Design a protein with these regions (language model features):
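A short, N-terminal "cap"/entry segment at the start of jelly-roll beta-barrel domains
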Residues: 8, 20-78, 122, 165-184
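A short beta-loop-beta micro-motif enriched in histidine and acidic residues
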Residues: 74-77, 89-104
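Short, surface-exposed secondary-structure edge patches
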Residues: 83, 102, 119-121
Length: 184
């Protein structure tokens, strides 16, 4: 069991080293403001995604856990997981993740609109999709009902999990900050 834990921890640490470099290209590490090179836009691949951009209806944090190295010492990284409910006919504001993450659908259906990706990724109950770091995206509720999903991110302790880049939607920025940005 300890060997498995060490392998998992080592793999996460290596991945996070790569993510740190990517993060430095997305946000200013002091202010956490979007890098001016990230386009502020209401479009993905030249088109406005379907549905109305909103905050989710409900968010609850399920897990906040510091990641430890093989000696049991904190690595400076934290895994955070939340459960959210998105109403039918809505979508997330266009945003960027400084560090990648995944969404797993419990009920309903989500469609990921991802910049520079012509195919829309759909996930139904029991399915997940990956949200890569540094790319503009929007999660669209493509079901005829509310959708319940679980989001998981591994981030440097105290970092944001997303940066809203859709004009007029800056008030949605604190949607996750209240859940995730308080894990300092």
């Amino acid at each position: 069991m300890l060997k498995k834990y060490i392998i998992i921890t080592g793999s996460i640490a290596a991945l996070m080293g790569i993510v740190v470099f990517i993060n430095s290209q997305i946000t200013d590490s002091v202010t956490q403001l979007p890098n001016p090179n990230i386009e502020q836009s209401d479009k993905i691949n030249g088109q406005v995604p379907p549905n109305t951009p909103t905050k989710t209806m409900f968010e609850s944090r399920l897990l906040t856990q510091d990641i430890l190295d093989d000696r049991g010492e904190p690595t400076g990284w934290t895994i955070v997981t939340s459960r959210s409910v998105r109403d039918k006919g809505t979508r997330s504001p266009i945003h960027v993740h400084p560090h990648g993450g995944q969404t797993c659908v419990v009920s309903g259906e989500m469609s990921l609109y991802l910049d520079n990706e012509p195919d829309i990724q759909k996930a139904g109950p029991g399915e997940c999709y990956w949200m890569p770091a540094g790319r503009r995206m929007s999660g669209v509720n493509s079901a005829d009902s509310r959708t319940i999903m679980i989001d998981t991110f591994v981030v440097p302790k105290g970092d944001q999990v997303w940066i809203v880049v859709e004009p007029g939607m800056k008030d949605a920025q604190d949607q996750f900050d209240k859940l995730f940005h308080t894990h300092k």
